[in-house]
Amino acid sequence: MGQKVHPIGFRLGVIKTWDSKWFEHKNYAQWLHEDIRIREFVKKSLNHAGVSKVEIERAANKVKVNVHTARPGIVIGKRGAGIETVKKDLQQFTKNEVFLNIVEVRKAETDAQLVAENIATQLERRIAFRRAMKKALQTAMKFGAKGIRVACSGRLGGAEMARYEWYREGRVPLHTLRADIDYGFAEAKTTYGKIGCKVWVCKGEVLPGKGGQAPMPSNR
């Protein structure tokens, strides 16, 4: 069932960690809704900056928001003016003090979320879906990905009947828990309706044990 389950959720606590790092008994629902609103706002207001993910950490009366972006200069702005504006806007979603941290995504070409959003943008510009998908595969492999799988579903090319098409290059082992699989999803809003774009990127294996080698199985 590795092909059905969410690749990041499947690896939580093994090689992946949570995007929201906090624990709460009483105000769980309130904090959860705050996190959702913060993420939606950051994605919407910084959609031109290539936001990959938003991590939220909470401690005492402080909220630390880590924004992973491919274009940190656009977010920061002149002399940090952009950060202050976003920080001020985020303060309306929570009573606690907000700290904003910008993290640069070094290789946007191998970031699954950014690749999915790039394909969706191309589909909205009426670029042929096969061309957009194959270009994403070639670029990711060129920038060091071990494997990549891209899938699009919906009324592809304006067809009468919706269908599902996918392409893969390299290896994408979804069942292997030590495999570092990045996953991203985006929707293209076309005149024919929505088209879903899913991307899986394999960045190699996270091997446990000393010297970066996996423990050898016993011969029992």
Swiss-Prot record:
Residues 38-106 form the KH type-2 domain. InterPro entries: KH_dom, KH_dom-like_a/b, KH_dom_type_2, KH_sf_prok-type, Ribosomal_S3_C_sf, Ribosomal_uS3_bac-typ, Ribosomal_uS3_C, Ribosomal_uS3_CS. GO terms for molecular function: mRNA binding; rRNA binding; structural constituent of ribosome. SUPFAM superfamilies: Prokaryotic type KH domain (KH-domain type II), Ribosomal protein S3 C-terminal domain. Keywords: Ribonucleoprotein, Ribosomal protein, RNA-binding, rRNA-binding. GO terms for cellular component: cytosolic small ribosomal subunit. CDD domains: KH-II_30S_S3. GO terms for biological process: translation. Transmembrane segments: none annotated. It comes from the Bacteria. Pfam families: KH_2 (PF07650), Ribosomal_S3_C (PF00189). Belongs to the universal ribosomal protein uS3 family. Binds the lower part of the 30S subunit head. Binds mRNA in the 70S ribosome, positioning it for translation. Part of the 30S ribosomal subunit. Forms a tight complex with proteins S10 and S14. This is Small ribosomal subunit protein uS3. It comes from Myxococcus xanthus (strain DK1622). The gene is rpsC.
